[in-house]
Amino acid sequence: MFIPPVDDVKPIPVPVEIYTQCITDASRFFGIDAELVFTLFDNEGGKVGTFSRNKNGTYDIGPMQINSSNLPEIRNHFPSVTWRVLAYDACASFWVGTWWLYRKIVDRKGNVFEGIADYNSKTPKVRATYIFNFMIKYNRRIQRRNGMDELYQWTQPKPQYNGHIVKNLPE
């Protein structure tokens, strides 16, 4: 069982330059849309040095909030990656988190959103809430990236020109 360190070190946010570069590189390597990984990081809310205790006694570690129950499997693939690395090396956390997401998507036969839900939980109710919140944040990221609200645009009738109407003319 994983027991986090007892210290007075406060978790610190990951600098924008670090998470931008590391997520971009890792997502490109694993062939995952970087916006999905950025959204996952945003949704998880982790920081360098974060240890979040779960109801089942496990911990979510570091910026990508990788669950401590996954440490043995991670060690099989990345022998030098320990909980300390995941907690305190932001870039390593992003690479391992992106790899973990990639594995979850592959396990779900390419279903991205099922893979994202699996990244967070196996509990159906928790998964449903998580993926709902994830999709809202993902849509906002896409809107910002594209400079428009894609979903809103698709669901609204096309604007029509009704002629030039002048209001508030002096009498």
What kind of feature is each model-predicted range?
Residues 2-165, 170:
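Catalytic glycan-binding domains that act on GlcNAc-containing polysaccharides
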